Design a protein with these regions (language model features):
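...with weaker cross-activation on analogous glycine-rich loops/strands in unrelated enzymes
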Residues: 178, 358-427
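Gram-negative bacterial Sec-dependent N-terminal signal peptides
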Residues: 6-24
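Loop/turn positions that initiate beta-strands
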Residues: 180-185, 255-263, 393-397
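Soluble non-cytosolic domains of exported or imported proteins
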Residues: 144-147, 173-179, 248-251, 310-317, ...
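Second-shell loop/turn segments in exported
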Residues: 169-172, 244-247, 305-310, 328-337, ...
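Aromatic- and glycine-rich peptidoglycan recognition patches
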Residues: 28-40, 47, 203, 211-232, ...
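Active-site nucleophilic cysteine motif
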Residues: 333-353, 357-364
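Boundary regions of SH3-family modules and the immediately adjacent low-complexity/disordered segments
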Residues: 27-154, 160-164, 170, 186, ...
C-alpha cells in the first residue's frame, strides 16, 4: 500500500522508463493525457474498452466445481484461513492468548492522533490494558456469532485512530479489516471495559465492537452462509429498503460478494415490514437482540439493487466489470472510510464470483493454494518484463505492501486496476511525478516507480493466478 504526494500534470510528458536499474525495459514515449494519469485515456476508464480487447471475454476460467476445489484447497493449505467448524468446543488459554497477543502488541514507536499530536503514553497504556490479556481463561466455551452491520476489525479494543506521523491522517495503525452482515465469527475473548469482543473470522482475527455481533448457536451461525436459495451482491454496494418497522435491517449496506438467504416461501401479498414485496427479493438477515443474542428478520432487497441468484461466472468480462464498479472509490486502509484497500479490493471482486482469497497482501502473495509465480533478486529485468507481458486478465501482481489486478494488455504493455494512495513516474525533466489518486485507479504497470531507483516491475515479488 504505497504512499505518494500529489502533483498533477496537464500537458503531455515523455517519461523516461528506461532506468539504469532496469535495462530490459525498452524506452517508450509515454504521455500524460487529460486524465492527468500516465498512459490513461478517457476511453480506458470504461470497462467496455477492456472487455473489447478480449478475444473470448465470456470464456469460463474456472467453473463452479473448479472454484469449489480451489476454495477447499485454500482452507486446507493456507494457514491464514481459520476453519470455524473445526474449532473445539472449549479453547485453551494458550490458543486464545496466541491470537490476541499476535495482534495486540504494545506500540514501541511514537504514534500521533487525528490532529497530529503525539498520543500520550498513558493513553496507549490504557488501550493495551483494555485487551484484558490477564483475564483470558483456560477452557472457555467457544461461542459463535453473526455480524449484523458492516464493522471495523481493530488491533486493539478502541476506536482511537493513530498514525505513524503527524502529517498522516489516512493510515490508521489500529485499523485491521472489516466484516460484512452475515459474516460468521467465533467469539473468544472480551475487553476489560466489556464493549469489545476478540473474534476469529474465516480470514482474520481481531477486535470488534460487541454491538455489531449477535451470538447464537453454532449450527445457525455457521449454516447461515450455506443456505439456499440466496442472493449475491454484485455491485460495489447494495442497500435494503428503508423500514421504520424494523430499523435493524433498514437501509442496511451489503458490500460486493455478500451472500444472503432468500425466503422463497414468503406468502404472496404478505407485507414485509409494512411493504409489499413484489418489487424486491425477500431476504433474511441476522439481527441483534437487546441481550446480544442472535435473531433473524426479513428484509427487502429491491430489484433495482445489484444482486444475482448465483455467483457470477469467473470470466474475463466479469473480472473487468466487477473491478470497474469500484472505480474512483476512496482508498480505505483496512476497509476504513466505508471503502477498502488494495487487498480488500481484489478480494471483493473475486468473492462475487465465489472465489475466496486471504485478507492481506502478505498472505495473498504467498498462498500455497493459488497458482503462484515467485520472484526474487535472482530474476533478471528481462525475465521480469517477460512475465509482465504475459500477464492475463485477473492475474494479481504483488509488490511489497501492494497488489494490482491485470485488466489487459495494449501493445505488450500490461494495464492494471488497483486501490492505491497514489502513483509515481518519471517525467521528461527526470523528476518524479506524483499523482495522489487515493482510490481505485487504472494505470499501465511498467512506468510506475516504486522509489527513485526501482520500478514496480523491479519490485514484483509474486504473481498469483486464479486460473489453471
Amino acid at each position: 500500500m504505497n504512499r505518494t504526494k500529489t502533483m498533477r500534470l496537464l500537458t503531455p510528458l515523455v517519461l523516461a522508463v528506461a532506468l539504469a536499474a532496469s535495462p530490459a525495459l525498452a524506452a517508450r514515449d509515454w504521455a500524460v493525457p487529460d486524465t492527468g494519469i500516465i498512459g490513461v485515456e478517457q476511453a480506458q476508464l470504461d470497462p467496455a474498452f477492456w472487455v473489447g480487447q478480449q478475444s473470448q471475454p465470456d470464456r469460463v476460467i474456472l467453473d463452479t466445481a473448479a472454484i469449489a476445489a480451489q476454495n477447499e484447497r485454500l482452507h486446507r493449505l493456507d494457514r491464514s484461513i481459520h476453519d470455524l467448524k473445526a474449532l473445539p468446543s472449549t479453547l485453551t488459554r494458550e490458543q486464545v492468548s496466541g491470537w490476541v497477543s499476535a495482534l495486540s502488541k504494545a506500540p514501541t514507536k511514537p504514534l500521533f492522533d487525528e490532529h497530529g499530536q503525539p498520543v500520550a503514553r498513558d493513553a496507549l497504556a490504557a488501550v493495551v490494558a483494555n485487551a484484558n490479556l490477564d483475564a483470558i481463561a483456560d477452557g472457555a466455551t467457544t461461542r459463535y456469532g453473526l455480524v449484523v452491520h458492516r464493522a471495523d476489525l481493530r488491533a486493539f479494543p478502541t476506536t482511537l485512530r493513530v498514525f505513524s506521523s503527524n502529517d498522516d491522517h489516512d493510515i490508521d495503525r489500529f485499523q485491521e479489516s472489516g466484516l460484512f452482515p452475515g459474516d460468521p465469527v467465533a467469539v473468544v475473548h472480551e475487553s476489560h471495559d466489556g464493549q469489545w469482543w476478540f473474534v476469529v473470522s474465516p480470514r482474520y482475527a481481531a477486535w470488534i465492537e460487541k454491538r455489531f455481533v449477535a451470538v447464537g448457536d453454532a449450527e445457525r451461525v455457521l449454516g447461515f452462509g450455506e443456505r439456499a436459495p440466496y442472493r449475491v451482491v454484485t455491485g460495489a454496494k447494495a442497500f435494503t429498503l428503508f423500514t421504520p418497522e424494523e430499523p435493524r435491517v433498514s437501509e442496511l449496506q451489503l458490500d460486493m460478494g455478500t451472500r444472503v438467504p432468500v425466503l422463497a416461501d414468503w406468502p404472496t401479498g404478505k407485507p414485509v415490514n409494512g411493504q409489499h414485496a413484489y418489487t424486491s427479493a425477500v431476504i433474511e438477515l441476522p439481527v441483534r437482540n437487546n441481550d446480544g443474542s442472535l435473531a433473524f428478520a426479513p428484509a427487502l432487497l429491491p430489484r433495482r439493487e445489484p444482486s444475482e441468484d448465483h455467483y457470477l461466472a469467473l470470466t474475463p468480462r466479469h473480472l473487468i466489470e466487477q473491478g470497474f464498479k469500484f472505480l474512483g472509490e476512496r482508498y480505505g486502509w483496512g476497509h476504513s472510510y466505508n471503502g477498502r484497500d488494495c487487498s480488500g479490493f481484489v478480494s471483493e471482486i473475486y468473492r462475487s464470483m465465489g472465489v475466496e482469497l486471504p485478507r492481506n497482501t502478505s498472505d495473498q502473495a504467498v498462498s500455497p493454494a493459488l497458482n503462484r509465480i515467485a520472484l526474487s533478486d535472482k530474476d533478471s529485468p528481462a525475465r521480469r518484463l517477460q512475465i509482465a507481458r504475459e500477464l492475463q486478465v485477473g492475474d494479481l501482481v504483488y509488490i511489497p505492501g501492494h497488489v494490482m489486478m491485470v485488466i489487459g494488455q495494449i501493445d505488450g504493455e500490461p494495464y492494471v486496476i488497483h486501490d492505491t494512495t497514489g502513483l509515481s513516474f518519471t517525467g521528461a525533466d527526470g523528476k518524479t511525478v506524483r499523482a495522489k489518486t487515493n482510490g481505485v485507479t487504472v494505470s499501465p504497470l511498467t512506468p510506475l516507480l516504486f522509489n527513485g531507483k526501482q520500478t514496480y516491475v523491479d519490485r514484483m515479488t509474486n504473481i498469483q493466478r486464479i486460473r489453471p
